[in-house]
UniProtKB/Swiss-Prot annotation:
The keyword Transmembrane applies. SMART domains: Autotransporter (SM00869). It comes from Bordetella pertussis (strain Tohama I / ATCC BAA-589 / NCTC 13251). Transmembrane segments: none annotated. Residues 742-1010 form the Autotransporter domain. SUPFAM superfamilies: Autotransporter (SSF103515), Pectin lyase-like (SSF51126). The signal peptide, cleaved at the inner membrane, guides the autotransporter protein to the periplasmic space. Then, insertion of the C-terminal translocator domain in the outer membrane forms a hydrophilic pore for the translocation of the passenger domain to the bacterial cell surface, with subsequent cleavage. Finally, the mature protein remains tightly associated with the bacterium. Residues 1-42 form the signal peptide. Pfam families: Autotransporter (PF03797), Pertactin (PF03212). Keywords: Cell outer membrane, Membrane, Periplasm, Secreted, Signal, Transmembrane, Transmembrane beta strand, Virulence. The gene is brkA. The record marks N731, A732 as: Cleavage. The keyword Signal applies. GO terms for cellular component: cell outer membrane; cell surface; extracellular region; periplasmic space. This is BrkA autotransporter.
Amino acid sequence: MYLDRFRQCPSSLQIPRSAWRLHALAAALALAGMARLAPAAAQAPQPPVAGAPHAQDAGQEGEFDHRDNTLIAVFDDGVGINLDDDPDELGETAPPTLKDIHISVEHKNPMSKPAIGVRVSGAGRALTLAGSTIDATEGGIPAVVRRGGTLELDGVTVAGGEGMEPMTVSDAGSRLSVRGGVLGGEAPGVGLVRAAQGGQASIIDATLQSILGPALIADGGSISVAGGSIDMDMGPGFPPPPPPLPGAPLAAHPPLDRVAAVHAGQDGKVTLREVALRAHGPQATGVYAYMPGSEITLQGGTVSVQGDDGAGVVAGAGLLDALPPGGTVRLDGTTVSTDGANTDAVLVRGDAARAEVVNTVLRTAKSLAAGVSAQHGGRVTLRQTRIETAGAGAEGISVLGFEPQSGSGPASVDMQGGSITTTGNRAAGIALTHGSARLEGVAVRAEGSGSSAAQLANGTLVVSAGSLASAQSGAISVTDTPLKLMPGALASSTVSVRLTDGATAQGGNGVFLQQHSTIPVAVALESGALARGDIVADGNKPLDAGISLSVASGAAWHGATQVLQSATLGKGGTWVVNADSRVQDMSMRGGRVEFQAPAPEASYKTLTLQTLDGNGVFVLNTNVAAGQNDQLRVTGRADGQHRVLVRNAGGEADSRGARLGLVHTQGQGNATFRLANVGKAVDLGTWRYSLAEDPKTHVWSLQRAGQALSGAANAAVNAADLSSIALAESNALDKRLGELRLRADAGGPWARTFSERQQISNRHARAYDQTVSGLEIGLDRGWSASGGRWYAGGLLGYTYADRTYPGDGGGKVKGLHVGGYAAYVGDGGYYLDTVLRLGRYDQQYNIAGTDGGRVTADYRTSGAAWSLEGGRRFELPNDWFAEPQAEVMLWRTSGKRYRASNGLRVKVDANTATLGRLGLRFGRRIALAGGNIVQPYARLGWTQEFKSTGDVRTNGIGHAGAGRHGRVELGAGVDAALGKGHNLYASYEYAAGDRINIPWSFHAGYRYSF
């Protein structure tokens, strides 16, 4: 029984002496947890008990009635439960915890002070109210904590109505603690809980329900909320409160242009941890920090706002500018969602207003709503945050400020990581008007019709390591926005855009930047940035548009323009021109202008400049066969030293040779142009060309440089030469047949390997080198015949040649061959052998064109070789011997037609070659113990090529074969028969001639004889 406990304890509770009256608690009962109060309220009051403790307050007295649930009714000027350190009001010590108390307060007389349900005042004064109810539906103040007092509300329900003042905690050391329960009320502009002048409020897992006014106000105090929910319902058509009169004192409710569920005034601090906050109705706002020193921190949780012209999170003064600017909001891991036209997720306004947003999601659903809006000096930093907007005209980030003369500095946004996505029509990923925005590692994408990734009117946009992309419009749009600016604000408007550190920008309609106004625009691409799309302006008038572009440090722009006033290409900067373009002033500072290679059926392009200076590279495409090419035209003064890199489609000029005009000048200035191609020459089809100026017309044209072959044609001619490979294969087998003459045997299996370096010079092509290596295996059988011995066998071999075309590149030949042979060794020293070999060869070359590109080709041919060799071995004293020999060889390869990767057409005729060789071997046969034999020798010979009929044609131009040539050959080697059936050989050779030199040739082999 509460009253029994109450009588047993000293008390300072002040009870009005007027008779108890029952209150209709319909509004309170409608709130959660209030229905249980109805039975107690329905009971009639009992007669007073004689001798009950009481105290006097405001001249009114009251008495308790003996009940389980005590009901306290408080009227104007009254206090329901008072724990006060004022000597005039001090009574006996109150119980530390009161339970199941039902307090009703009213404020009827505007000339009187409002009634107070609970008041705790004074250091050391503490009271806990549990499981109780405070009804303020008729006005009044539910609770007051001041002067260092402490009040704890545990599971308490507070119901407020019109005229209710907020529960207030004020003064340093004062604490109001709310755990669980429901706090609700209808109090326009007043609030449910107010912390002032250093007071502290802590709310845990409670439900706050505010109608037509804020739930929390921190005005010089601090409020901490953990868990639970906050709801504010503004109702339909709710107007904002009027501004305060000049000189009027600051009231409990703020004179603002918006009402928020949570307010932080001057030096007020509010922290919300994992709180679900909802605000409903026109002009509703979630949280609002609006004065110097005010701070609101959201950690986790959600903010949901429904209604037009509101906001989710706001920092800074309102549009009325009635208060000094200031306010800071911090969000970490929070989700902010708005569903209303012109209702921003985060709004920061004023020079001293700040927002810090980390790991947060910001969403807006209706038209003209921004994910982040920084206005009039406000500053916002975002880290790893996702912004999503869906309405027409919505903006992911809006930066709006006035000119300095308007009294406000520029606003700014700094965002690192995360993304910005807009899906509405006529929307913008970022909108910039007199301010600055820096995006680092942020992906910005605009999906809707007429929507741009960036819409700019004035200010600076820096995009680093991120992207700007528009699905249906230009990536960047520059436009006037007079509705967002004060009069005269456009007078000094400029737009600066800088993409750096690998940032990308691309418009879905093929436009990178669209200029809708005469605002000067400066675009800079740096440090690997890439922009794709054209730069265009309404009317395509470059002088009116005032657009300048600079590209440097590995950055590139792929697009065309007719409106650039100036373009500067710094070191490492590239402009890829994909259509006819015009620039008023071009300054080359080590950069590169590259004409995009035309697609099939596409026309070549012309870049027209009014002036040109500096130094740089121009990359132009040509098709000499069609007489078409890209052109650079300078209509005014041209200065500087420039280089021209020419890329050809692979066609061939007519018989008169190519004279394609690449660069056209007016003869004004000192500009010079030279080829940037390798060797200062251009490969065009079969021939090489140089660049020269016509002194009369001042046109720089390509002219054929004599009979020099292009790199591709040179490789095609040299690749067709297989006779040198056939000679290397034949030489390997010669060693095997020579070994048969060492001693008679029944034949057997054998294996040989060889490698030799060849330096070859063709008559109509440049010299090249190749290393030919191979492996052969075979099996033969020997039998005795009249006057000698016969051998017959077969072979299988693989050959690999690695070719080097000096200054151009290289190639490879891979061949497989099979063959058969027969040999006769007479008893009188005569011998005769013949070989037939059939092969298949895969020929490849890969060379560097003079334009820096690669030219490749790969084709296959077949070949056949037949040789006949004869000689006689003369035995000399002391086991010396001399062996003269002669050989004839026929070689034929099939023809082939193919096209190289650059379009060069190649026709290789079938080739027939005839060779003859005369030679002499001189050596000594050395018999060793056990029947072993070692035979060292030296060799001298001459090889002559008598005929070569195969020609090579490139683009229809013929190149004759190598013709007659010869070479001298020197060599040394050793043959050995060791043990039973084991035979080894090794040799070295050198050859020199007018067409082929062999600096070294090594052979080694083994056979086993039966």
